[in-house]
C-alpha cells in the first residue's frame, strides 16, 4: 500500500504540532497520546481507558493530557469549574459528542441527558418533585415489593442450582422497580427469572453508545460505519425505542393508575401548563430505564462482592441491621437512613466501584474558562473530564485507596483516614446537571442491601473471586457474580 508524501507529511506535521505547539502542550502526559486521538480511541474501544487513566494520574498528577484536545483531571477544585453552577459564561457545557442518545429523535426532541442547559433546567424542574422524599415514600410499596421478590427468588434459585448470580438478580429487581415507575407495570423478570429482550438490549445499547462516542471523533469512519451498519442492527434499535415509547404512552393514557409513579407528579405540572411534551416524556422514559437500572444494579453487585471479600465488614453491617430490626417488614425509607454503617458501606461502595468510573466530558466554548483559577491554556473546543475511578483510588486523596473500609466515612474516622478527601467522591456527578435520581438510588440501595444481608449469610464462589477486575464501556462489563446463600436463623 502506497502512502502519498503529502499525506505522510500532514500526519507528521499534525503530530509534531499537537505534541509541542498545541495550546494544551504544557499539560503533562505521554507524547503518544498528545500526538493523535487514535491511542485513546483504541483504549475506549477495548474497555481499557479507565485503567490507563488511573496509571497516568499516579505518574503525572492531577492533570493528564489523554489526547490532543482532551484533559483528564482528578482535582476536586477543578470539578467546581467543570461541573458547577458558576462556570464562567457557560464556558464548560456538556460535550454532546460523547452521548449517543443525542439527536436520536426525528422531531429533535431531547431528554434530561441530552438537552441544552436551559431546556435541561426546564425539564428538571418538572421532574424534581417525582424524586423528592415525599414522592419516594409514596412509591415505597413498589420498592418493598421488588426487594422482597429479590430476597425470595434469589434464594429459590440458589436452592435449585446450588449458587446464584446476583448480577442477574439485582438487574431484575432494579429494572422491574423502575419499569413499574415508568410503564405502570413491571416486565416481571423476578417472577419469570428470565431476561426480557428489552433489558437484554440495554447492555448492548450501552456498549454501542461507547463505540459511537469514539466514532464521533472520526467523522469519516462514522459515516462509513453508519452507511454499512447492518439493517438488522438498525431494526433492533428502532424496535427497542418503539417498545419503550409504546409502554410509556400506554401508561400516560391511563387516567387512573393503580399506584403513584414518576408520571403522577409530572402530569400535575402538565396540567398547570408548564409540563413536558409527549415526545419529551417518551425520551425521558427511555433514559430513566437505561440510566436508573444499570447503575444501581452495578453498585449493588459491587457492594455484595466487596462485603464478601471483607467478612469482618459484612459481620459489622449484619450486626447493625439485624440489631435494628426484628423483621424486614420494619425496614422503610424512614428507618433505614438512620443506620450509619449501612450508609457508610454504600458510600464506600460508590468510592471503590463508581458505577460510571470514567469521566463525564465537558467542552470549553468560551475564552477565559478557568480550571483551578488558571485560564492560560484552556482553548476553545478542548474537552475536560473528572476521572472518577482515578480520583477515588488516588493515594493523594485516600489512605489505602484500594481497600474497602466503610469506617473512613464515619463522623469520627480512625486517625489513619482523618485526612481522606471525601469530597472527591462525586459518583452522581455535581452541579446543575448532577443525577436527578440520586435520592431514589440511595433509598433503593439501602432497602436492597439491608434486606439482603438481614436475611442471608452470603458466601462468594471461587469463580467470582476476581469479579471486580472488569473492562469499562461507560459502565463496567460485569461477569456473573456467583454466591451461595444461607438463611440466617435469629436466636430470638
Swiss-Prot record:
Cross-referenced PROSITE patterns: CYTOCHROME_P450
Principal EC category: oxidoreductase
Domain of life of the source: Eukaryota
Residues the entry annotates as binding heme: 435
Gene Ontology molecular function: any one: iron ion binding
Pathway: Secondary metabolite biosynthesis
UniProt keyword Oxidoreductase present: yes
SS bond list: none
Practical applications according to UniProt: Radicicol is an important pharmacophore as an inhibitor of heat shock protein 90 (Hsp90), an ATP-dependent chaperone involved in the post-translational maturation and stabilization of over one hundred proteins, and which activity has been implicated in diverse pathologies ranging from oncology to neurodegenerative and infectious diseases.
This enzyme's EC code(s): 1.-.-.-
Reported cofactor(s): heme
Gene Ontology terms describing biological process: biosynthetic process
Keywords linked to the UniProt accession: Heme, Iron, Metal-binding, Monooxygenase, Oxidoreductase
Function comment: Cytochrome P450 monooxygenase; part of the gene cluster that mediates the biosynthesis of radicicol, a resorcylic acid lactone (RAL) that irreversibly inhibits the HSP90 molecular chaperone, an important target for cancer chemotherapy. The radicicol cluster encodes only two apparent post-PKS enzymes, a cytochrome P450 monooxygenase (rdc4) and a non-heme halogenase (rdc2) that could introduce the epoxide and the chlorine, respectively.
Family per record: Belongs to the cytochrome P450 family.
Protein name: Cytochrome P450 monooxygenase rdc4
Lineage, highest ranks first: Eukaryota, Fungi, Dikarya, Ascomycota, Pezizomycotina
Gene: rdc4
